[in-house]
Amino acid sequence: MALAKTIMIQGTSSHVGKSLLCTALCRIFKQDGFHVAPFKAQNMALNSYVTLTGGEIGRAQGAQAEAAGIAATVTMNPVLIKPKQDLNAQVVVLGKPLADMSARDYRANFLPKAVNLVGQCIEELRREFQVLVIEGAGSPAEINLKDRDIVNMRTAILADAPVILVADIDRGGVFASLVGTLELLEPHERQRVAGFIINKFRGDIELLKPGLEFLEQRTGKPVLGVIPYLHEHGIEQEDSVALEGNKNVSSGSEIDIAVVKLPRISNFTDFDLIGRVPGICLRFVCPGDPMGTPEAVILPGTKNTIEDLQYLKEKGTDQEIIELARKGIPVVGICGGYQMLGKMLYDPWGTEASLESITGLGLLDIETTFFKEKQTHRCKAKITCTELNWCGITNQEITGYEIHTGQVKLGREAKPLLQITQRSGNIVALPDGAVGNQGHIWGTHLHGLFDNKALLLSWVNSLRERKGLSRLTLAKLPDNREEKYDNLAEAVRHHLNMKQLHQMMGLGEGKP
């Protein structure tokens, strides 16, 4: 059986749109009849995705697999690095935590093994699929990191992939960044770059043409496309850079929801759908900044619950949240944020930090103990708590996923929010989450909760009713994932020379 054809998307820097373009290409190749898969050798992110087998990979590769119409596997992102403290990170290998390492430890003790692992995963995927869409990281020309960079040109060589270099014109300096990146590559790496894509363009393309002609003449490499700035693509963004300046991700301000932007916030994609509901203003508020007078507050997940809770207290944000809760403002906690809402958090094995215990916000009658083993599961569940006066979907099935080491014990004044009925494919009956006596403070370990449209609609409508606003219907909620992937593919296909891309990949006429 022939090995899969490959294409690799690299960038001149972080946040130029590599992940989104790879997602679009996965969908385009799927639409064209190819059996396609994504790949990224090593990902550094706090937004992770749980596979059907309970493995943890980068969120972007999970979305790319969805766009490709396949189930994500751990081979699609064999190494995931999750920053835990300023000089320390958890290294996840083939979906399971290996160890906490410093950058120096990683380089000395694991990097050679990682290179071999990447090669094995690429070979496995190339034998299974017809096309492999590979994503790089940051820039391939980071001189100080070049000797330990396994995710860019070293991956391209292992996969025998032509490289498309992408730059973000919206930030300015696009031609300097492309030419400069190319100049800093080794000669054999430069030869592997097959062409360029200019991303996030606004304005008249005619005004850009002299620059495109210069770029092609200077480098001898073609520009395959100029992709417009896609404002409303609706695809989850993995990089926390996406949160910079993101004070309002939805037009309109009937309902104001404040998400606390914890220093080590993880899986902020939990709130993507909320932010696109008509009439909702979703704000990410840094600890220490005024919370204002929101209709609801959300404490999100975090890679280090104890240290982020300490930071909240140092900035006084804990007292602000407590005061809002006392006024009857709904407060929701997801995973680490849920644990923060409790009375006490214990870390006897130093899983999270050197601090053995810390008091929580005391808004829920729960206590959390952190253990060494991490729970990662795809789940099905049912809301069981009748004290939730906003919830009209009791006993309806919802889906989500768990990524946590903390185990929560409920006190007398808290009731379970839901019951997990399926965990990593196994039938179970496990309580999760907690609801306070008055019903407006609640939390859960389940990420992805607000991706369940019926639940989201019920919660949003409860906020609207408190303010005397009319209820929304399901028809008012954003498009589903499949439509988003199709729309993204259509937008990118229209501005990309797919025929030229097929030729670079050796796909001939671009048909299976």
UniProtKB/Swiss-Prot annotation:
Keywords tagged on the record: Cobalamin biosynthesis, Glutamine amidotransferase
Claim: Translocase is one of the keywords in the record: no
Gene name per UniProt: cobQ
Organism lineage: Bacteria, Bacillati, Bacillota, Clostridia, Eubacteriales
GO molecular function: ABC-type vitamin B12 transporter activity; catalytic activity
Domain GATase cobBQ-type intervals: 254-455
Example of a GO biological process term: cobalamin biosynthetic process
Annotated source species: Desulforamulus reducens (strain ATCC BAA-1160 / DSM 100696 / MI-1) (Desulfotomaculum reducens)
SUPFAM superfamilies hit by this protein: Class I glutamine amidotransferase-like, P-loop containing nucleoside triphosphate hydrolases
UniProt family annotation: Belongs to the CobB/CobQ family. CobQ subfamily.
Pathway membership, UniProt: Cofactor biosynthesis; adenosylcobalamin biosynthesis
UniProt xrefs under CDD domains: CobQ_N (cd05389), GATase1_CobQ (cd01750)
Annotated catalytic residues: C335, H447
This protein's name: Cobyric acid synthase
Entries under InterPro entries matching the protein: Class_I_gatase-like, CobQ/CobB/MinD/ParA_Nub-bd_dom, CobQ_GATase1, CobQ_N, CobQ_synth, GATase_3, P-loop_NTPase
Function: Catalyzes amidations at positions B, D, E, and G on adenosylcobyrinic A,C-diamide. NH(2) groups are provided by glutamine, and one molecule of ATP is hydrogenolyzed for each amidation.
One of the Pfam families matching this protein, by short name: CbiA
